[in-house]
Swiss-Prot record:
Keyword RNA-binding belongs to the record: yes
Species of the source: Saccharolobus solfataricus (strain ATCC 35092 / DSM 1617 / JCM 11322 / P2) (Sulfolobus solfataricus)
Task of the protein: CRISPR (clustered regularly interspaced short palindromic repeat) is an adaptive immune system that provides protection against mobile genetic elements (viruses, transposable elements and conjugative plasmids). CRISPR clusters contain spacers, sequences complementary to antecedent mobile elements, and target invading nucleic acids. CRISPR clusters are transcribed and processed into CRISPR RNA (crRNA).
Protein name in the entry: CRISPR-associated aCascade subunit Cas7/Csa2 2
Keyword Phosphoprotein (UniProt): no
Keyword vocabulary terms for this entry: Antiviral defense, RNA-binding
Pfam entry (one): DevR
Family: Belongs to the CRISPR-associated protein Cas7/Cst2/DevR family. Subtype I-a/Apern subfamily.
PANTHER family membership: CRISPR-ASSOCIATED PROTEIN CAS7_CST2_DEVR, PTHR37459
Additional free-text comment from the UniProt record: Crystallography and cloning were done with strain P2, while interaction experiments were done with genes cloned from strain P2 but over-expressed in P1. The aCascade complex was purified from strain P1.
Source species, domain of life: Archaea
Subunit-level organization: Part of the aCascade ribonucleoprotein complex, minimally composed of Csa2 and Cas5a, which binds crRNA. Other possible components of aCascade in strain P1 are Cas6b (SSO1437) and Csa5 (SSO1443), while SSO1399, Cas5b (SSO1400) and SSO1401 have sometimes been seen weakly associated. Csa2 is probably the major RNA-binding subunit. The Csa2-Cas5a-crRNA complex also binds target DNA homologous to crRNA, probably forming an R-loop. Purified aCascade forms a filament about 6 nm in width.
Annotated S-S bridges: none
Amino acid sequence: MISGSVRFLVNLESLNGVESIGNLTKHRTAPVVLKTSTGYLVRYVPVISGEALAHAYQASLVDIAKKEGLPVGSLSSQYEFIKFSTDEALKIEGIKEPKDYNDARRFEVEVMLKDVIADVGGFMYAGGAPVRRTSRIKLGYMIPALRGDEIPAQLEAQFHVRFSNKPVSGSQAIFNVEVSSALYTFSFELDEDLIAVPSTFGEKVKGEEELERQKAKRVKSAIKALYSLLSGNFGGKRSRFLPSMKLMSLVVTKTDFPFMPEPAHDDDYIKTTIMRLGKAKGVLNGNLAKAYVINNEGIEVGEGVTVLSTVEDLVVKLEEE
């Protein structure tokens, strides 16, 4: 299992808009609870949804999988991650719907062989005999670091005018876009051991041997696709609101047991993660427990970690293990 917590310093972004009200395009916000010197408080803060991060990850996986010669479905090739949710989608992809629950494993394997994105990112067929595959990549909301009384985040609407050099009614318009600046954090988990492995119970079906043959390539592609998230290549409205973005720090662990690093709110999150990792290895009788750190803000990282300089170095390390 590969898991991580990440900190980005992001200035002037509009990566996750949610709606337009008149001439105002709003940024996504959500309530968070934080502990302050006076007790627990609720605050609404700018956020970037896990769906936005997952879309960027899967789009990156499409490009990487094609280069690796792995199968990508017709809809996924268009970066439309409807996958195999409806009968209409099955017709487009050339997959026969499941007859009943006993046919679910056959259906899941055929879908996985057709589209590596459905293998890694999961899918939910909602027809007469529903079949679900849980995503092997898990992503939460990207939220500001919760650091005591002050949250390092701010929203403000920026004024713009669409200019016209001719006096035509409606051609020159005012519009406002909410932008955010924040010290953002997010966490992720990639269960690479379960990639190319059917999740539906039942006897082995045709095609599983081919999945086993492709597994190494599929895992490699899934790890490479993390690069888009760790390098900040995600979100929308980038053509005119490309943010000033810097990776401040991260900790990524690779284990053979379930483990999630500390959220990147406090400055000791890496040190605490390393301390917990050693204890978790003992509690769960683990054999593999490695930690990789990038530290561009001079915080404590603890002992027994591999400190790297760049995200590129990190991805290479994860592939090698």
